[in-house]
Amino acid sequence: MIGKLVRDLKIPDQRHPEKAHRPDNDQPRKPSWIRVKAPTSEGYKETRDIIRGQKLATVCEEAGCPNVGECWGQGHATMMIMGEICTRGCTFCNVATGKPQALDAFEPGRVAHAVSQLGLKHVVVTSVDRDDLEDGGAEHFAQTIRAIRHRAQGTTVEVLVPDFLKCGPEALETVVAARPDVFNHNLETVPGLYPEVRPGARYFHSLRLLQRAKELDPQIFTKSGIMVGLGEDRQGVMQVMDDMRAAGVDFLTIGQYLQPTPKHHRVDRFVTPEEFASYEKAAYGKGFLMVSATPLTRSSYHAGEDFARLRAARLERLGA
């Protein structure tokens, strides 16, 4: 009930009390290449009903993803585990901040059941930050991966994890040992914007997390993403690409930042589709196996199709 109330609140000060002191930022009108249609399809409704029936949260809803109509219409959803309330207060994010509830021991099984009901070939599992937990929720991630493997055999699993900043190294080791097919952790923005955009995180810690995941399991695909339009410049984006490649990241996503409410970080500008195409070309030139760079790209957007292409790209490179 608490989660539903939080999700349904429309007043930014109530959903994001940590941002109440911030001055309002204007929300510029979105250009034509950003606008999407309201979700109305039967597929969308069926996906929604399965998610509701299993009492699950999705980042699609909690973060206000613009692609929810398209993805849910195709029966795809990104499961968000460990509750709907985050212990961090990143200025770009629309997920509610506050004191989370205790973990639900039955959630991994319900996620697996929903994956089976939806008939997913590839599933993305993410979470809120849980700095209140000793392991940051690592074991809960591992249990969810194992439950999906048991209930939906043949489904590939992608995890989008928090940074485990306040945990020991065993947290990351626990997740990687559960053998997800893709290990994703987003850097989100250039390091110079971290104090404003991602104040509870550390750029080089996140970078090392990605590098260490690859060291623990060289066969795992690693993935990371950033938003643009936050105030970064092209040189900064290029440096992040270089840092990711040095950490062994295989798959890069770049998407346009969209401001959830006036209390959130302002949109500095809308990056044009041509600029995104230029970023994609540059990223492939730096050696990424897979790149998705469009205004509406999000971490799990077209994740299933992209995983198939990612796997094919690795095989092609190994055969070259």
Curated annotation (Swiss-Prot):
Principal place of residence: cytoplasm
Binding site for [4Fe-4S] cluster 2: C86, C90, C93
Domain Radical SAM core: 71-289
Basic and acidic residues: bias regions: 1-29
SMART domains: Elp3 (SM00729)
Keyword hit for ATP-binding: no
PROSITE patterns documented for this protein: RADICAL_SAM
Keywords, ordered alphabetically: 4Fe-4S, Cytoplasm, Iron, Iron-sulfur, Metal-binding, S-adenosyl-L-methionine, Transferase
Reactions performed catalytically: [[Fe-S] cluster scaffold protein carrying a second [4Fe-4S](2+) cluster] + N(6)-octanoyl-L-lysyl-[protein] + 2 oxidized [2Fe-2S]-[ferredoxin] + 2 S-adenosyl-L-methionine + 4 H(+) = [[Fe-S] cluster scaffold protein] + N(6)-[(R)-dihydrolipoyl]-L-lysyl-[protein] + 4 Fe(3+) + 2 hydrogen sulfide + 2 5'-deoxyadenosine + 2 L-methionine + 2 reduced [2Fe-2S]-[ferredoxin]
Cofactor: [4Fe-4S] cluster
Localization annotation: Cytoplasm
Disordered: annotated segments: 1-32
Record bears the keyword 4Fe-4S: yes
GO cellular component, as recorded: cytoplasm
Note accompanying the cofactor annotation: Binds 2 [4Fe-4S] clusters per subunit. One cluster is coordinated with 3 cysteines and an exchangeable S-adenosyl-L-methionine.
Pathway: Protein modification; protein lipoylation via endogenous pathway; protein N(6)-(lipoyl)lysine from octanoyl-[acyl-carrier-protein]: step 2/2
PANTHER family: LIPOYL SYNTHASE, LIPOYL SYNTHASE, MITOCHONDRIAL
Protein family: Belongs to the radical SAM superfamily. Lipoyl synthase family.
Protein's recorded name: Lipoyl synthase
Originating species: Cereibacter sphaeroides (strain ATCC 17025 / ATH 2.4.3)
